Swiss-Prot record:
Species this protein is from: Schizosaccharomyces pombe (strain 972 / ATCC 24843) (Fission yeast)
Gene Ontology annotations for the cellular component aspect, listed alphabetically: cytosol; ERCC4-ERCC1 complex; nucleotide-excision repair factor 1 complex; nucleus; site of double-strand break
GO biological process, one term: mating type switching
Subcellular location: Nucleus
Disulfide-bonded cysteines: none
Name of the protein this chain belongs to: Mating-type switching protein swi10
Pfam families: HHH_5, Rad10
Signal peptide, first to last residue: none
Length: 252
């Protein structure tokens, strides 16, 4: 008998297992994509999820079965538990035991719910409360394809910079002035435009009198008081300034 290398042996074993499953009448399970031994770029899947209809729809990132406590791990500190509402109605205690077992092992814990029943309102309300109490992020998916997209997206954006979703600071003069003025309680963008239209610049507005400010459209006494308090009060109270101790210049 000729020698068989590891790869050939693995292929023979897989073929034999598939043949046994066909004869036994087992449903065909999705095959994990082949990945390198380094799993940093793949979604980790708990073997209990074999047969989950969402798995065939995870096509844009690799995934593989491995021994983990959650159902899916999409990155360092990011995991997900999966729950079908149809299964939840039959086994309502299941998800609570899974949450208890997982504990707080991950920074971001997601409860991915597949809404596959018509009467779902009461169950969703119950699971929302459970998610809040246990500090989970709850996501509702209305199909297996949608659920798979959520897993793929979390994995794809795992190492993305937060700058992608951060508000870009405005650099033009008007936006910067409006940002400053609207930071004062009670003053909105319309108020800031009225102020700039009247005085032409922030510099002139800062030295305007109370009477001039009260003539602005939409500026009543309360708004004027808040504006003047904000621009006239000192940055630091004199009572909080500590004077340095006197230095003894005498020779000892």
């Amino acid at each position: 008998m000729s020698d068989i290398d590891d790869e050939e042996f693995e292929q023979l074993a897989v073929s034999a297992l598939e043949e046994v499953e066909k004869k036994a009448g087992f449903a065909q399970q999705p095959t994990p994509q082949k990945v390198s031994r380094v799993t940093a770029h793949s979604i980790l899947v708990n073997p209990r999820q074999k047969g989950n209809p969402l798995l065939p729809h995870v096509r844009n990132v690799p995934w593989e079965y491995t021994d983990i406590v959650p159902d899916f791990v999409m990155g360092t500190g990011i995991c997900s538990l999966f729950l079908s509402l149809k299964y939840h109605h039959l086994h309502p205690e299941y998800i609570y035991s899974r949450i208890s077992k997982l504990g707080k092992s991950y920074n971001l814990r997601i409860l991915l719910i597949l809404v596959d029943v018509e009467n779902h309102q009461a169950s969703i309300q119950e699971l929302v409360k459970t998610s809040i109490v246990n500090q989970y992020t709850l996501i509702l998916a209305w199909s297996s394809e949608e659920a798979a997209r959520y897993l793929e997206t979390y994995k794809a954006y795992e190492n993305m910079s937060p700058a992608l979703i951060m508000e870009k600071p405005s650099t033009d003069y008007l936006s910067q002035v409006q940002s400053f003025l609207t930071s004062i309680r009670g003053i909105n963008k319309s108020d800031s435009l009225s102020l700039l239209s009247k005085f032409g610049s922030l510099e002139r507005a800062l030295v305007a009198s109370r009477d001039e400010l009260e003539q602005l459209e939409g500026w009543g006494p309360t708004k004027v008081n808040r504006f003047l308090e904000a621009v006239q009060q000192p940055f630091m109270s004199h009572s909080t300034i500590k004077r340095p101790e006197a230095i003894n210049l005498k020779q000892t």
